[in-house]
Every structure is written in C-alpha cells, then in structure tokens.
C-alpha cells in the first residue's frame, strides 16, 4: 500500500490495491495499518516531489450517455490487450528462465531491448512522455510527434499502425527488462498500453466508422483504467489510480 501510494502519489489506490489483490479481511485491525502506511508514504512523496498530479489532464468534453456502447467495446478491447500482455510476458520471461547463465540473460535482454528501442523510441523508459502527449494532444500534428526519431518519422498517415505495433512490442521490451535482470514492473507498462489502446480505439473509430465522435484523450484515459484493471485483476484500483494520477 505504501509503495503504490508513494510512487504514484495515490494513497486511496494504494489502499484499494492491497485490499483487492491480497483480499484481506475488512476489519479495523487490517485497514488501519494499510491506511497509515499509504497516507504516510503519499505525504512524504508530496513533501519531496510536490503535490502536482503525475499526469496533466483537462476534461474538454463531458461524458455523454450515447457513448456507453463504445465504452463497453473499449472495455472488451482493453481486456484482450491485458490478456495478450499477461500471457505474452509470461511466455517471454519463461524463455529467459531457461537461460541458466546470468550473463546470457543480460546479453539476450540487452540485444532485444536495444533493437526494439532503436526501431521504436517510445518503448524507452516508462513511456510517461507518450502518455502525456496522448492525454493532452488535440490535433494530428501533435500526436504525430510520438513518431519522432523513428523510422516512421514523417509518415503521419501511419500513426495508428505505429501505435498498434507498439502495443504488440511493448510486452517484449518489458520482458527483456525483467528477464535480463532489470526491474520493469507491470504498473507503468499497463498504464502505457492502456493509454495507447484507448487512443487507438477512439482514433480508429473516428477515422474509419460512422459512429459518434469519440474524444481521443477521454478514451485514452479510460483505456489506462481498463488495461490496468485487466492486468492486475483489480478494477477498483484501476479507477482510483487513474483518478489520482490525473
């Protein structure tokens, strides 16, 4: 609870995450230590790094009831993405597990990660810059900057293809980090994939279907909660974490 609260400045999400994942009894003796840990960690984080939310997000368009069917479809899509992420990561890390020599793991992971980052620079790091861009961009010209320094640079018409490839390859980058001896975790990759999945879903719908307009930034935010919920099997954590992150 304290780790999640401190890293993401999200005390409520830290508390709810522990309750959902560990499924402990809802008694005062179990809740009070979690609450103290989460609040203390978040307070220290606020004091040392400031009180600003991790991601800036401005709600330009309010939610409309006519979009509910598309939100349900987004949830299904995010569920499939989270299933792919979980199973593919287990498979790739299983390959690393068969390498007994730690230097072979390091070399294999390093080569894989180097090639992926060279071809797709947004795979480097947590991907928070990409999330910030998709949550705040308002035009194709701004969204296209996600392809800067890549072989897709200058091909704005391939933005959806580029982002879908990132969805497919992010799991290999995360697995190479973890399997090679690093610590990539699954929280940040889940948020990253969710944001891209929500953006791809809404952008594809707006460009290639006759449905109602779907605000890309809103669906990117909902996608973050969707994939996080699917990967962690913790829907309430996804909701509260995204609420506190923005």
Predicted regions and their residues:
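Alpha-helical transmembrane segments and immediately membrane-proximal extracytoplasmic
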Residues: 1-246
């Amino acid at each position: 609870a304290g780790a999640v609260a401190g890293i993401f400045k999200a005390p409520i999400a830290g508390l709810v995450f522990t309750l959902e994942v560990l499924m402990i009894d809802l008694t005062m003796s179990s809740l009070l230590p979690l609450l103290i840990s989460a609040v203390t960690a978040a307070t220290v984080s606020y004091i040392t790094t400031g009180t600003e939310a991790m991601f800036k997000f401005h709600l330009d368009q309010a939610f409309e009831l006519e979009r509910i069917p598309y939100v349900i479809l987004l949830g299904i899509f995010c569920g499939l993405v989270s299933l792919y992420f979980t199973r593919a990561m287990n498979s790739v890390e299983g390959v690393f597990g068969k390498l007994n020599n730690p230097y072979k793991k390091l070399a294999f992971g390093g080569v894989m990660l180097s090639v992926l980052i060279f071809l797709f620079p947004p795979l480097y790091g947590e991907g928070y810059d990409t999330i910030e861009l998709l949550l705040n961009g308002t035009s194709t010209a701004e969204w296209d900057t996600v392809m800067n320094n890549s072989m897709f640079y200058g091909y704005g018409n391939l933005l959806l293809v580029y982002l879908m490839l990132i969805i497919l390859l992010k799991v290999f980058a995360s697995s190479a980090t973890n399997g090679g001896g690093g610590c990539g975790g699954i929280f940040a990759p889940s948020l990253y994939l969710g944001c891209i999945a929500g953006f791809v879903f809404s952008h594809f719908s707006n460009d290639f279907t006759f449905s109602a307009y779907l605000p890309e930034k809103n669906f990117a935010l909902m996608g973050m909660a969707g994939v996080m919920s699917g990967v962690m099997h913790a829907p309430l954590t996804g909701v509260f974490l995204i609420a506190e992150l923005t």
